[in-house]
Amino acid sequence: MDPIRRHLLKAAGLFVTSRAFANDQQGTSMQPSSVKPRHVLCFLGKDESLLHPPEAVARTIADFGFEIDRTYSQARPDPHMERSFGVCWDRVFPKAWSAADEAAVANHKAVLYLLSPPLEQQKAVAFSAAALRIVEEMIEAGATAVKGESAGIAHGLERWRSLGDQARKGAKTSQGLGMTLAVAKACRLAFAKRPLGGDRYNETVGYHLVGLPEIYVAKSRGNEWAAVMLMEELANAMAERSIEATLRDQKLTLTREQDYAEDDFKFNPYGIIRVEA
């Protein structure tokens, strides 16, 4: 077993509380939700072999507690995929997908869905890193397109590979492998989408997959790029110093009010931070 795989398995099962979660997660009197997030990964392929991953990949899926959703996976094209990927492509990172990626979506012949186990907040980054590892192995095995359903985010194959590489390299420290800030950031970039334009805010969705609350930035503060920069700044601060400390230092508060119902995969049980004008 390679060191990265061993490290991820250990982190997912024997995770030691890190600085990002050293204090009260809410930083307010808000009662915690009992909802636990889950990854839903969507893979497209050229034929029905997609539904039967190679033994090595199947072992990785099982080792990390993921499972194939046999109800919605299918050995035929899904006519809605072009539109779905069209609204999910990451539009922040330059050239996050290519014409070849669009063609792969248009020409797919099979769809596979994977579900993660419910995520504990302290283990969210570890399981997201595992999800990224599974994405890499599925691409290696022939998957032609990948989308994170829990936040509605899609990247091209090269971008997925790059994010996986970032997570691997980011796990290396002078003391060995660790769930570092670099790993958390790679997972956030892989599985969260931003900015989504609401009526009043530019919003994130998917930060629950790395154990963080969503960040909503008032549109009156500036353009979308300014909102993305602030989202990154606050997310990095929460991962490094703790949610509570960041809320205190920035004089921000959490709220539970959100548009997603608790049974929606986009529901964030850790709340929302609204940054007003």
Identify the residue ranges that each predicted region occupies:
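N-terminal low-complexity, intrinsically disordered segments
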Residues: 48-103
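Structural alpha-beta junctions
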Residues: 62-71, 133-147, 236-246
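N-terminal secretory signal peptides
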Residues: 1-7
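N-terminal export signals
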Residues: 7-24
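Internal, hydrophobic cores of structured domains that mediate oligomerization or house catalytic pockets
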Residues: 82-182
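N-terminal alpha-helical "arm" segments
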Residues: 27-48
